[in-house]
Amino acid sequence: MYSVIIVAAGSGRRMNLDINKQFIKLREKEIIAHTIQVFYENINIDEIVVCIKKEEEDFFKENIINKYNFKNIKIAYGGKERQDSIYNGLKKLDKNCDIVLIHDGARPFVDHRIINESIKVAKEKKAVVVGVPVSDTIKIVSDGTVKETPERNLLWAAQTPQTFEYNLIIDAYEQAYKNNYYGTDDSMLVENIGQSVTMVMGSYENIKITSPEDLNIAEQILNMEKRDEVNSRRRII
């Protein structure tokens, strides 16, 4: 059984808006609805859990689930930190779950190739992150001074989904809470217990929408986007 947790319990702070950025519309459709739609249409995904703020539950049900006729969507409440929200989502998953994908609700341009490849590799390697090679030269800076310039060919920008064997990610989260450890993404928790993580090529279009500038880029992506309907219909054995 393949499940996805979509994290949508953030805010619109960097957008300078009073509403959750997930509810901002792209082409008359909310960002979170775009994101859910991709996983909803993917034949390999058996279960969808969306993490939202408790106070936004009624709005989410009326304006997303009911409006777009999504069926069997589970809801988990957001926590203080992103990690807490995901842990709440993990507790909502069916116990028959084999592989779980964890995805940012504000990344609506994830495609079926990424989803399917993540599941396929996770079945063999247990832990998978999607990402892209960085195009800029990265500097490590301390107190305004450049301390080091890492080799660019070794650097990747991590994206989501991040995909894990169910028992592994549960163990990683339980160990993290036991040791009061908070990571900036889920793969850090898995790395923290000694599990290697495999990188799968993501997409430069798989952006996270967090600023007004990102919204402009998202509109441009929509203008040229073509959904890969064929890949969405290929069930992974």
Curated annotation (Swiss-Prot):
Molecular-function GO terms, alphabetical: 2-C-methyl-D-erythritol 4-phosphate cytidylyltransferase activity
Keywords, comma-separated and alphabetical: Isoprene biosynthesis, Nucleotidyltransferase, Transferase
SUPFAM superfamilies, alphabetized: Nucleotide-diphospho-sugar transferases (SSF53448)
Highest taxon in the source lineage: Bacteria
InterPro entries: IspD, IspD/TarI, IspD/TarI_cytidylyltransf_bact, ISPD_synthase_CS, Nucleotide-diphossugar_trans
Swiss-Prot/TrEMBL site (Transition state stabilizer) positions: R14, K21
GO BP annotation list: isopentenyl diphosphate biosynthetic process, methylerythritol 4-phosphate pathway
Annotated site (Positions MEP for the nucleophilic attack): R152, K208
Gene3D superfamilies per UniProt: Spore Coat Polysaccharide Biosynthesis Protein SpsA, Chain A (3.90.550.10)
Enzyme superclass (EC): transferase
Pfam family, one: IspD
Pathway stated in the Swiss-Prot or TrEMBL entry: Isoprenoid biosynthesis; isopentenyl diphosphate biosynthesis via DXP pathway; isopentenyl diphosphate from 1-deoxy-D-xylulose 5-phosphate: step 2/6
Enzyme Commission number(s) from the entry: 2.7.7.60
PROSITE patterns referenced in this protein's UniProt entry, alphabetically: ISPD (PS01295)
Function according to Swiss-Prot or TrEMBL: Catalyzes the formation of 4-diphosphocytidyl-2-C-methyl-D-erythritol from CTP and 2-C-methyl-D-erythritol 4-phosphate (MEP).
Family: Belongs to the IspD/TarI cytidylyltransferase family. IspD subfamily.
Protein name: 2-C-methyl-D-erythritol 4-phosphate cytidylyltransferase
Record organism: Clostridioides difficile (strain 630)
